[in-house]
Amino acid sequence: MIKNPKVLILTAHYGNGHVQVAKTLEQTFRQKGIEDVIVCDLFGESHPFITDITKYLYLKSYTIGKELYRLFYYGVEKIYDKKIASWYANFGRKRLKTLLQVEKPDIVINTFPIIAVPELKKQTGISIPVYNVLTDFCVHKIWIHREVDRYFVATDHVKELMVDIGVPAEQIVETGIPIRSSFELKVNPEIIYTKYQLCKNKKILLIVAGAHGVLGNVKELCQSFMSVPNLQIVVVCGKNEALKQDLLSLQKQNSDALKVFGYVENIDELFRVTSCMITKPGGITLSEAAALQVPVILYKPVPGQENENAMYFERKGAAVVIRDDSEVFAKTEALLQDDVKLLQMKEAMKSIYLPEPAGHIVDAILAENHAEPRHIPIKSPALAQSFT
């Protein structure tokens, strides 16, 4: 029995989702008394210049580079078995070998498709358990490697896709995608209405605009929605200060109809009171929406995993997917007026959600490695005051 295993979690800063999952797992390990946990951005530490370029191209996929990203995502899927695996497997290898030699972890977890560790296992025969935590509602072959001991996935649908491409079913565990613990707490909504100056007798539309130009023509949309009676619009701009300042000038015209925020630490609070949300179809955001049963309108998904995520939620009846700017206002207004449809979407979200994914993943990993967890109780935090 390993009383205090050392855990290495490998991730990457392509969007915030992969890192957020890594941090959630880290916190869950610590809550269970496993304190020796390291989170490492392997690619960023190994090749910072190349990583910065690829991160820039990734962000551009939301605006001008959609076709380029489509070619990359689906092109890699087609040729992965041939050539790209050998190149990708060695990316970050030097830094990884140093990490393994210095830190000597007992367990390695990937929240980004990094195959350097399983490839090293294959080539050198080192014995270290490797776990992949998939962060979308689809699967790309780049996640798959024979030396991965276990895969933790979002849904039975993802499990079926993996079995179809040859992964043994017993290596795949359906747990859901790890989300922040705040999304799984019970909170009195009355406090939230007061905190954000919202009216519980009106419909609330949450727009998560993001910091990278993910959602276009936000100001024009807000102007249109402000004309809808009995509706409050809440826009979260993230770290996009220019967008925030632009919308604050609009808010002055009707501060009851439009509420503008920058970065909101406890964004789960807004999820809890919104009638529906316009956002992008990232795996983590969708998992958080499912946890709180928030109907979503998914705006112009980027080809690749976001499009696959969007199609899955659309098939399940939990999302409306909009691919044309001209449809955003009409389809959103129609949904807000259709209480039956909103309720059906909430029920669909409920059917997708699997509770406490991080806890189940950590428990499974510790059990497989005969580690002894020591639960440390954590108080439910009071409502945070940090929003700008």
UniProtKB/Swiss-Prot annotation:
Classification via InterPro entries: Diacylglyc_glucosyltr_N, Glyco_trans_28_C, Glycosyltransf_28_UgtP, Pro_diacylglycrl_glcsylTrfase
Pathway: Glycolipid metabolism; diglucosyl-diacylglycerol biosynthesis
Pfam families assigned to the protein according to its UniProt record, in alphabetical order: Glyco_tran_28_C, MGDG_synth
A molecular-function term among this protein's GO annotations: 1,2-diacylglycerol 3-glucosyltransferase activity
One GO CC annotation: plasma membrane
Keywords tagged on the record: Carbohydrate metabolism, Cell membrane, Glycosyltransferase, Lipid biosynthesis, Lipid metabolism, Membrane, Transferase
Enzyme Commission code(s) on record: 2.4.1.315
Enzyme class name: transferase
PANTHER family referenced in this protein's UniProt entry, alphabetically: MONOGALACTOSYLDIACYLGLYCEROL SYNTHASE (PTHR43025), MONOGALACTOSYLDIACYLGLYCEROL SYNTHASE 1, CHLOROPLASTIC (PTHR43025:SF3)
Family assignment from sequence similarity: Belongs to the glycosyltransferase 28 family. UgtP subfamily.
Protein name: Processive diacylglycerol beta-glucosyltransferase
Biological source species: Bacillus cereus (strain B4264)
Chain's gene name: ugtP
